UniProtKB/Swiss-Prot annotation:
GO terms for molecular function: ATP binding; four-way junction DNA binding; four-way junction helicase activity. Residues 144-158 are annotated as: Flexible linker. Residues 65-143 are annotated as: Domain II. This is Holliday junction branch migration complex subunit RuvA. Belongs to the RuvA family. InterPro entries: DNA_helicase_Holl-junc_RuvA_I, Hlx-hairpin-Hlx_DNA-bd_motif, NA-bd_OB-fold, RuvA, RuvA_2-like. It comes from Treponema pallidum (strain Nichols). Residues 1-64 are annotated as: Domain I. GO terms for cellular component: cytoplasm; Holliday junction resolvase complex.
Length: 227
């Protein structure tokens, strides 16, 4: 019903935004990761949205990009995960780390998400493993295009500090040591640069290669999940 809302940001909290559009203020529930992507109060923002409605309530959920919304909707299809729980998941783990955990069948990484027990993690893998790769690539395309248009100097082999930090953070959230993760990501990024390929286009591949490299070189690097 609502694809997105564009307007002036009037409230900016960790998991809640208010956006004014032509004199009407919309309250939007967001993940902590999406919230961090928006600017200061008074700035113009575009929020991708999904409307949750039932007999006694209407609620808008918002996302900084289409990728996160796609993940959110996929999570709500898992038995036992409703919209509120799906948003909590996305506040606890980055989209990159979640996609990687689902794609590689990393049950331990999923169990480290607050509120996700072993049975729910197993249901997530059963429902979503192997289903997000193409969706992830397609939904990332628009946000990557927009980012390249806004920052044309970041093309080619220019430094990708934000993308590198996102990848390192994703690995840390999966239980890997930050220093080891940073070293592997730096190596993979340099390898891409040496053949003239862009990290913008290869982020998901780099994350998978880093997980494989860390698993081989440091098989005990991931801390076991709490019982």
């Amino acid at each position: 019903m609502f694809e997105s809302i564009s307007g002036i940001l009037t409230l900016h909290e960790r998991e809640r935004l208010c956006v004014e559009v032509h004199g009407i203020e919309w309250e939007i529930a967001v993940s902590a990761y999406s919230s961090a992507a928006f600017g200061e109060v008074g700035s113009h923002v575009k929020v991708f949205t999904w409307l949750y409605h039932r007999e006694d309530a209407l609620r808008l959920f918002g996302f900084s990009n289409v990728q996160e919304r796609t993940l959110f909707l996929s999570l709500t299809k898992v038995e036992g995960i409703g919209p509120k729980q799906a948003l909590k998941v996305l506040s606890s783990i980055s989209s990159q780390a979640l996609c990687a955990a689902l794609d590689t069948g990393d049950l331990c990484a999923l169990q480290r998400i607050p509120g996700i027990g072993k049975k729910t993690a197993q249901r997530m893998l059963l429902a979503l493993k192997g289903t997000l790769a193409l969706t992830d690539a397609a939904s990332c395309a628009q946000s990557q295009t927009d980012d390249r248009a806004a920052h044309p100097s970041n093309l080619g082999c220019a430094p990708h500090a934000r993308e590198i930090e996102d990848l390192v953070t994703a690995l840390v959230q999966m239980g890997y040591d930050r220093k080891m993760a940073a070293e592997v990501i730096a190596q993979e990024s340099a390898a891409l640069c040496s053949v003239g390929r862009s990290l913008y286009e290869e982020e998901a591949t780099v994350l998978k290669r880093a997980i494989l490299a860390l698993s081989i070189a440091h098989p005990h690097a991931v801390a076991p999940a709490a019982e």
